[in-house]
Amino acid sequence: MDGFSEYDPEKGIPLAIDPNLISIPVSTSLTTNGNGDEGVNNEDATVFAADDADNAKSQKSLIQNPYEYFGQMPLEQFIPLMLQQRGTGTKFADIHEETLLEEISRENSSKSNNAIQEEDNDDSAIQNVDEKTTTVVNEGVSDSHEMKDEDGDVNMDVPSVESSPKLAEEREPTADANDAQRAISGNQEESITLEEFKMIKKNVLEHVNMALNESSLSLEFVSLLLSSTRTSAGISSMSPYLKKIAPPASLNADKVPLDILDEHEKLTYDIIHKGWNLRSLEDCKRLLKQHYQILSKSVESEYHYWKQISDNITNKDVLFKMKDKNTGRRTLGIKYGFDDSGSCYSADKGIALLRATSEGSQLELVPIIDSGINVGISRGSSEQFVRVRIFTKIEQEDDYLLSGQSSLNELLLSSRSDIKSQIAKLRFFIFEKELMHQLKKEAGQLLPYGVSVENENKVLLELSNEKIEFELINLDEEVTSNYQQEAAKVNDKRANLILVMLNMLLVVMYKKQLWKRLNPNPHSSKSSKGYGKDLVLLRAILGKIRHKKYTQLIEKIVNNAILEKKEDSIMTTNTDITSNDNEPSKNKELATLQREIALFDKILSMPRTDFTINIPEKGKLELSLRSTNHCNAIIHMKYIDVGQVVKFDTRFSEFTEFEEFLNFVYNEFLI
């Protein structure tokens, strides 16, 4: 298409926009009356205008635009319409691009064949019309010769070829045939390929969209400008988006007169302009410098922060992300508790924040005591440790004298404030708190054996001639100074050993709990029976002390009842009686835990001592001092004569009964 095609009433006007956007007046008759009467012409024009006004909707459209009907149609409407036109049984999934291309090619070929056939028909019709026209003209000429008057002049009353109705009817098909021939030739000249049509369509759509966008922007600008003077008119044409972001009457236009400046004023304005630019540059320079300093300080602080973490945190420490409730920032948390090692202590979660100090030069640990409460590493109630003191009874008096006290841990006397020291202190404090918690829990089961809980931080163990006190005290300057000033006592070493033993037994308790967690079938192993019993802390120490007292008492009874009376008799003692029936686990980790727990079997096992009394010519007497709960005493007694015959085998739980029966045996069998 060259853009200069003439107007064709059959084809319409070649436009590239939607015809609904414009209003085209209906074309009037292009022919005039042959008589040239102006009154008749005016009357005909009036009649045509009235008919056009009444039948505007029934007139044939000047423009053929199928895009008007299908271009703006949504897919949910277009797809059913297309399937309906293609016939029943057609599925949209069966329509492919290749199928559509084949249909388009077949349609184009059929159209070209039809056009050729119509052209042949038009040629034959034109030839027939020419022959008819020639015949009619010849007849008219012959008639004109025949209609001459007597003088030989032609009669003017005879109608001419142009004014003859017959000739006019014959000429109209000739004009229609010529128009059809021109239309066919025009269609052949204006035919384009599918690719060219798509390209033209794409360009037209781009230009239309651009024109619509520009017109919309222009309308928005004019509406906003109009709203300052005519609010209702401006708001009615404004889009909802513009109403939301730009209030009405926010744009105005004024006519400002342009004053012509002289050279001096131009120079002044130029200097002011450069001054403002210079001031803006100075402000930018100052802001950039400030932000650079802030960023440099932040980078330096971050560098020191991560360097200290790298220097003080090892691969054994557990780090994780958490939120600092004081600052609201995401930071690192460290787990200093012993939950992963087998601890069941839940009063303190053992979690602390790694927070940089205000100066940013050092890190500090902020432990989280419970949910929502953050407590710093300042000396306070959270710093507590267990102290062991031994009180010895004064002879012939009811008063007790302090004879021993556990020493203060060197970690508490250190003044170092680095992260390693802080982590070590936090672990020490939480370990001491859990130790006191377990001591109080176990003391409730040992009340019949002289163990009592005086308050929430003190457990007292009473023996025959001494008292052992376990107390959780706060770490303050007074306690520290008292430890440094007090002189050494007799039982200080014993108090330290008791405290160390309690710490080691608590570690063994951790290992037992960890063994239970790692063992998939804890009831299938023989060692699970021993690991599943009550936890042993005070019970083990108290049992050893009481067992030693019981052993001394039995030796005294045997010495008075037999050894002093039978000088040749000999008593031997065996205390190293431990049995290890635990089968080694095939799991490497479980086997390691079993070996570590087995190191404490001697103190964790029930105390037992065997006595063998050999009496010449009378046989032997076997005694076994045992316990069922670490604290009580059960005596097994068996007498075997010279002939290896067991005379009796009995058991006692009271020492008075044992002493009486031993005297009876001596009088009946050993004299």
From Swiss-Prot:
Signal sequence extent: none
Domain of life from the UniProt record: Eukaryota
Span list, region Disordered: 104-188
Gene Ontology biological process terms in this record: regulation of transcription by RNA polymerase II
GO molecular function, one term: transcription coregulator activity
Annotated Pfam families: Med17
GO cellular component: core mediator complex; mediator complex
Cell compartments where the protein resides: Nucleus
Task performed by this protein: Component of the Mediator complex, a coactivator involved in the regulated transcription of nearly all RNA polymerase II-dependent genes. Mediator functions as a bridge to convey information from gene-specific regulatory proteins to the basal RNA polymerase II transcription machinery. Mediator is recruited to promoters by direct interactions with regulatory proteins and serves as a scaffold for the assembly of a functional preinitiation complex with RNA polymerase II and the general transcription factors.
Family the entry assigns: Belongs to the Mediator complex subunit 17 family.
Protein name: Mediator of RNA polymerase II transcription subunit 17
Record organism: Kluyveromyces lactis (strain ATCC 8585 / CBS 2359 / DSM 70799 / NBRC 1267 / NRRL Y-1140 / WM37)
Higher taxonomy: Eukaryota, Fungi, Dikarya, Ascomycota, Saccharomycotina
Gene transcribed to yield this protein: SRB4
